Swiss-Prot record:
Expressed by the venom gland. It is found in: Secreted. Residues 1-22 form the signal peptide. Has the structural arrangement of an alpha-helix connected to a beta-sheet by disulfide bonds (CSalpha/beta). Keywords: Disulfide bond, Ion channel impairing toxin, Neurotoxin, Potassium channel impairing toxin, Secreted, Signal, Toxin, Voltage-gated potassium channel impairing toxin. Its main location: secreted. The keyword Signal applies. Pfam families: Toxin_2 (PF00451). Potently blocks voltage-gated potassium channels (Kv). The record marks 49 as: Basic residue of the functional dyad. GO terms for molecular function: ion channel inhibitor activity; potassium channel regulator activity; toxin activity. InterPro entries: Scorpion_toxin-like_sf, Scorpion_toxinS_K_inh. This is Putative potassium channel toxin Ts22.
């Protein structure tokens, strides 16, 4: 059981590190396709989402 908790803690820490790589840019949007060119310009990657009318880029 101790091994399970240890693996769970490691998984949570790795997930937090991965989530911290997201980049919000000050660009308004209504659909995710509007974020792609803005994210390519900002960080050089096309992976993006439109969340709460703001573009979120993923490196």
């Amino acid at each position: 059981m101790k091994a399970f908790y240890g693996i769970l803690i490691i998984f949570i820490l790795i997930s937090m590190i991965d989530l911290s790589q997201q980049v919000f840019i000050n660009a308004t949007c209504t659909v995710s396709s509007q974020c792609r060119p803005k994210c390519i310009e900002a960080i050089g990657q096309a992976a993006s989402k439109c969340i709460n009318r703001k573009c979120k880029c993923y490196p």
